[in-house]
Curated annotation (Swiss-Prot):
One biological process term in Gene Ontology: cellular response to heat
Region (C-terminal): 769-860
Region: NBD1, residue numbers: 161-342
Subcellular location(s) per record: Cytoplasm
Species, as recorded: Leptospira interrogans serogroup Icterohaemorrhagiae serovar copenhageni (strain Fiocruz L1-130)
Residue numbers spanned by region Linker: 343-550
Region of interest called Repeat 2, as start-end residue ranges on this chain: 84-148
Subunit structure, interactors included: Homohexamer. The oligomerization is ATP-dependent.
Record carries keyword Thylakoid: no
Purpose: Part of a stress-induced multi-chaperone system, it is involved in the recovery of the cell from heat-induced damage, in cooperation with DnaK, DnaJ and GrpE. Acts before DnaK, in the processing of protein aggregates. Protein binding stimulates the ATPase activity; ATP hydrolysis unfolds the denatured protein aggregates, which probably helps expose new hydrophobic binding sites on the surface of ClpB-bound aggregates, contributing to the solubilization and refolding of denatured protein aggregates by DnaK.
Protein name: Chaperone protein ClpB
Sites where the protein binds ATP 1: G208, E209, P210, G211, V212, G213, K214, T215
Coiled-coil region list: 393-527
Positions bound to ATP 2: G610, P611, T612, G613, V614, G615, K616, T617
Length: 860
């Protein structure tokens, strides 16, 4: 007997057997050591064969370990002289005899077990016979497993039963009810069946955007095959999905991956068309396993695909199909494309209705139909970079998950009561140490209060536990219904009519009644007194959308409505003297939040015109602060940086092949990260005219395609463009208001193209600041300075004389409010800073800033 032709698994087992003998202190490697290692190989042949005989590999392993425990042991270092025992040599000889009979080249682990059961003489064979293992049955299952092949190399394990190892049986999953129902994809499933039924090139490839339901179509086909709702051509066929990850994992040596793939393909081929192979992300096969001089996986598939020996369904996205499969013309012609389009909102609602039961069962909650409609419509409108129905299903799943967590967590009311009790207990312990009368009186009052609070807490807790148990019971009944529906479908497939009738008209009817009564019981509790909510509503979906995108799509609360109605007044406190401009901006935002604006355009597009320093940029800042509670929550793009025609690439991202392609554009990336935002394009007349072309689609369609070809959604942005065009006309006192408007309009038409001006919602003229409003502006600027001083521990007030002085000295009709800001900064700011630096003040001190004898002074 030669020991040079052992399979890698048997080599590994013998090596481990030697290590095991040394560890246990046994003087020799016995047949028990070898069999223990052979039986404990998780992906070995022996456990697989025993399982196929409907026996437990675990019981055989335990029996072997018991026999090992009775082996003699020696003390000291045994590693030097551990050799094979007589029983081990006999076992290997018996295995070699079996190998010769089966005409195998290599000695494998299955030969070891066959050799033991055929020619073994020890107690282990007797034990195995008691456990039900017989030689002729073992030989029969071994030959069946090999499918007429002999062992010609050292890794047969990777090639036997390759389908079971490297693919998942979708038919089995469908029978067990583990696949989600597939709704509204009949046309695509029919087209797939049509291609599969061809004589040659019967390989459909499903092409569609990520998340449109390509894999779901194959799962739908598996369901239809199991239910027998398919043409004769593919009736009783078995659908397997290839697990490329497990095929590549552990393929250490060159050619091992190809061996495994070849074995799997041969198994599919030998099934005579009974197996249909589904390869998800089929583009991963192109280049898989292609090391130096080796074929890649796709080239191994080509001959079988062309001859019709392999029926295969592929699935990939359009981008990857173009990148990998279209490049390889020979591979492309062997596949027949089936395009899977994104479903409409109405179709998505139908799909969600079909899936609703599964999600209700998993999370143990109820999903209202209005929530399904909201998930489809809101995801379509606000989540633009993903596809239906995937994004709508995700919304339902996350809202349900949030609801489940809330049911399992302590309700807010109960949590508050618990914290109050803890606080009172701490106070009680502190009062017990006090001896005065007031403390003793307070302790008595506190004891009564604590007793009431604890009683209230126990009542609330009992209510919570009761509601939880009722919701839990609902989940339990639904699980029972699902289980019996699967049993009914299985019985129907087997033709057990009596069993079907027993389940359908007996058990399911009873469970349905039980479910209705449990629902009624839960509804009896007043909704106002309920601690737990177990229904996912439209509002819950809207909250999840808001959390994902930052866009406020949930129903407006009373406080927000009042805030929006007062929007104009709030803005007037920040920007003085531009009431007309503020009214137009407020109206646009109110229209959008009330839901009556055009949903396919930005919230509002405004062109602010006027001389410098009149409040154009300040209005944008005030609006950002009002909408987002943060003055910095706006994307400001200074158009003076875009004077060259090529600088448009900085806004939308460099095209492929240029430096900076991966970085994206300043504008598009800002909006992708924050879809609900304010974008300020400052001083647009300074930009190159070419740059305005990108504004056309933003202002009209509310979208822009960036350098990577992605659509960026501007529908939830407020766009403000500022310009100084015609500022000398608006600042002049020579013209009337009507003349100013007409002259500025003429200037605009000269500078901007008609298609650009036509897309702007409102052109808002900011008029020069008059001396009547300069006092109010001075008040705002001084208040800002007062706040800064307060942060440094100084409480400042300003006299009317000072206010009169800065208003007169800082007013300049030509330059607006900026000279006033500079004057306050220079004179009042300097006076305060000198006072602080002199160290004359104490923290929290009150000082007054006055104007006396032509000087700004600080008075304590």
């Amino acid at each position: 007997m030669k020991l040079d032709k052992l399979t890698s698994k048997l080599n590994e087992a013998i090596y481990n057997a030697q290590a095991s003998a040394e560890k246990l202190g046994n003087p020799e490697i016995s047949e028990e050591h070898i069999l223990k290692e052979v039986l404990s190989q998780p992906d070995g042949l022996v456990p697989l064969l025993i399982s196929k005989l409907n026996l437990s590999p675990k019981s055989f392993l335990e029996s072997t370990e018991n026999a090992l425990g009775k082996q003699p042991k020696v003390g000291g270092n045994t590693s030097a002289d551990v050799g094979f025992s007589r029983s081990a040599v006999s076992l290997l000889k018996a295995a070699d005899e079996v190998r010769k009979e089966l005409k195998d080249e290599y000695l494998s682990t299955d030969h070891i077990l066959l050799g033991l059961m055929k020619n073994g003489t020890g107690s282990l064979k007797t034990e195995f016979l008691k456990l039900g293992l017989e030689y002729h049955k073992l030989l029969k299952i071994t030959l069946e497993n090999r499918k007429g092949k002999t062992i010609m190399d050292d890794s047969p394990e990777g090639k036997t039963d390759a389908l079971a190892k490297y693919a998942k049986n979708l038919n089995e999953l469908a029978k067990q009810g583990k696949l989600d129902p597939v709704i509204g994809r009949d046309e695509e499933i029919r087209r797939t069946i049509q291609v599969l039924s061809r004589r040659t090139k019967n390989n459909p490839v499903l092409i569609g955007e990520p998340g449109v339901g390509k894999t779901a179509i194959v799962e739908g086909l598996a369901n239809k095959i199991v239910q027998g709702e398919v043409p004769e051509g593919i009736k009783n066929k078995t659908l397997y999905t290839l697990d490329l990850g497990s095929m590549i994992a552990g393929a250490k040596y060159r050619g091992e991956f190809e061996d495994r793939l070849k074995a799997l393909l041969d198994e599919v081929k030998s099934s005579d068309g009974e197996v249909i192979l589904f390869i998800d992300e089929i583009h991963t096969l192109v280049g898989a396993g292609a090391t130096e001089g080796a074929l890649d996986a796709s080239n191994m598939l080509k001959p079988m695909l062309a001859r019709g020996e392999l029926r295969c369904i592929g699935a990939t996205t359009l981008k990857e199909y173009q990148k990998y499969i279209e490049k390889d013309a020979a591979l492309e012609r062997r596949f027949q494309p089936v395009y899977v389009k994104e479903p409409s909102v109405e179709e998505t609602v139908t799909i969600l209705r079909g899936l609703k039961g599964r999600y209700e069962l998993h999370h143990g909650i109820r999903i209202l139909d209005s929530a399904l409609i909201a998930a489809a419509t809101l995801s379509n409108r606000y989540i633009s970079d993903r596809f239906l129905p995937d994004k709508a299903v995700d919304l339902i799943d996350e809202a349900s998950s949030k609801m489940r967590i809330e049911i399992d967590s302590m309700p807010e009311e109960l949590d508050r009561a618990n914290k109050r009790i803890q606080s009172l207990k701490i106070e009680r312990e502190a009062l017990k140490k006090e001896q005065d009368t007031a403390s003793k009186e307070r302790l008595k009052t506190l004891e009564r209060d604590l007793s009431e609070q604890e009683q209230n807490f126990q009542t609330l807790k009992a209510r919570w536990d009761l509601e939880k148990s009722k919701i839990g019971r609902l989940k339990q009944i639904k699980e029972e219904i699902e289980k019996y529906k699967n049993l009914e479908a299985e019985a129907e497939r087997r033709g057990e009519i009596n069993r079907v009738a027993e389940i359908r008209y007996g058990k399911l009817v009873d469970l349905q009644k039980e479910l209705e009564s449990a629902n009624e019981e839960l509804k009896k509790q007043e909704s106002a007194s309920r601690l737990l909510k177990e229904e996912v509503s439209e509002e819950d979906i809207a909250n999840i959308v808001s959390r994902w995108t930052g866009i406020p799509v949930s129903k407006m609360l009373q406080g927000e409505r009042a805030k929006l109605l007062l929007m104009e007044d709030v803005l007037k406190t920040k920007v003085i003297g531009q009431d007309h401009a503020l009214r137009l901006v407020s109206e646009a935002v109110q229209r959008s939040r009330a839901g009556i604006a055009d949903p396919n355009r930005p919230i509002g597009t405004f062109l602010f015109l006027g001389p410098t320093g009149v409040g154009k940029t300040e209005t944008a800042k005030a609006l950002a602060e009002f909408l987002f509670d943060d003055v910095n929550a706006m994307t400001r793009i200074d158009m003076s940086e875009y004077m060259e025609a090529h600088s448009v690439a900085r806004l939308i991202g460099a095209p492929p092949g240029y430096v900076g392609y991966d970085e994206g554009g300043q504008l598009t990336e800002a909006v992708r990260r924050r879809p609900y935002s304010l974008i300020l394009f400052d001083e647009i007349e300074k930009a190159n005219p070419e740059v305005f072309n990108i504004f056309l689609q933003i202002l009209d369609e509310g979208r822009l395609t960036d350098g990577k070809g992605r659509n960026v959604d501007f529908k939830n942005t407020v766009i403000i463009l500022t310009s100084n065009i015609g500022s000398e006309i608006l600042g002049s006192s020579e013209y009337t208001s009507e003349e100013k408007e007409r002259l500025v309009e003429q200037r605009l038409k000269k500078h901007f193209k008609p298609e650009f001006l036509n897309r702007i919602d409102e052109v808002i003229l900011f008029h020069s600041i008059t001396d009547s409003v300069i006092h109010k502006i001075a008040d705002i600027q001084l208040e800002g300075l007062r706040q800064k001083a307060k942060e440094n521990g100084l409480d400042v007030s300003f006299t009317n004389e000072l206010k009169d002085y800065v208003s007169k000295a800082g007013f300049d009709a030509e330059y607006g409010a900026r000279p006033l800001k500079r004057l306050i900064q220079r004179e009042v700011g300097n006076a305060l800073s000198r006072y602080i630096l002199d160290g004359k003040f104490t923290n929290g001190q009150n000082v007054t800033v006055d104007y006396r004898q032509g000087k700004v002074v600080v008075v304590v």
